[in-house]
Amino acid sequence: MNLLIMGLPGAGKGTQAAKIVEEFGVAHISTGDMFRAAIANQTEMGRLAKSFIDKGELVPDEVTNGIVKERLAESDIAEKGFLLDGYPRTIEQAHALDETLKALDIKLDGVINIEVNPESLVERLSGRFICRSCGSTYHKVFNPTKVEGTCDVCGGHEFFQREDDKPETVKRRLDVNIAQGEPIIAHYRELGLVSDIQGNQDIDDVFADVKKAIAAIK
């Protein structure tokens, strides 16, 4: 079984990916892990990627696509199948993946799309705040301080938000992800591969829906 999992930042994609891998025994292929392994093993594409990273430059698509192809050609993929996580990020990468799968004679069985309302994601992702004195991290909805305005750990009263966690920054980041992701989802929807999963539920309820979708694919 060969799957792709998609979802906006904060949608719980990573949590569901881990559960899928544990339940079904497929190889978890995440972009970060692929890059680290290719560089550590000094593959042709790994050496190329490292040359860009060492210069502080973005790794070009053709190198990223090459690293994905190297990984998908490994023997465990034929034995176990895979869950691809974090790739493709652009429609160009999606088309490159189509070509890679065709070249390797691999069939993509389905795309799990974790859907969460963007406004809910802004709340999830922008609610984090940090104690200035001891660095303890809280969330205004999911993990507030026991006493409002007082750190549970050190009793401090000064808190701050990282720039990345501010609502306007989070919204900008989500807008970019939505703009990049919509054409990819549309592409796979045309191929009849997409299963939409409602992510605004308890983690176990989301996974129950994921399992139903996978059962329908199988």
Swiss-Prot record:
One of the record's GO molecular function terms: zinc ion binding
InterPro entries linked to this entry: Adenyl_kin_sub (IPR006259), Adenylat/UMP-CMP_kin (IPR000850), Adenylat_kinase_CS (IPR033690), Adenylate_kinase_lid-dom (IPR007862), P-loop_NTPase (IPR027417)
UniProt region (NMP), positions on chain: 30-59
Coiled-coil region list: none
Binding site for Zn(2+): C131, C134, C151, C154
Gene3D superfamilies associated with the record: P-loop containing nucleotide triphosphate hydrolases (3.40.50.300)
CC terms in the record's Gene Ontology section: cytoplasm
Catalytic activities: AMP + ATP = 2 ADP
Residue segments, region LID: 127-165
Residues annotated as signal peptide: none
Predominant place of localization: cytoplasm
E.C. designation(s): 2.7.4.3
GO annotation, biological process: AMP salvage
Localization, UniProt: Cytoplasm
Oligomeric and partner information: Monomer.
PANTHER family, alphabetized: NUCLEOTIDE KINASE (PTHR23359)
Reported function: Catalyzes the reversible transfer of the terminal phosphate group between ATP and AMP. Plays an important role in cellular energy homeostasis and in adenine nucleotide metabolism.
Family from the record: Belongs to the adenylate kinase family.
Protein name per UniProt: Adenylate kinase
Native source organism of the sequence: Streptococcus thermophilus (strain ATCC BAA-491 / LMD-9)
Gene encoding the protein: adk
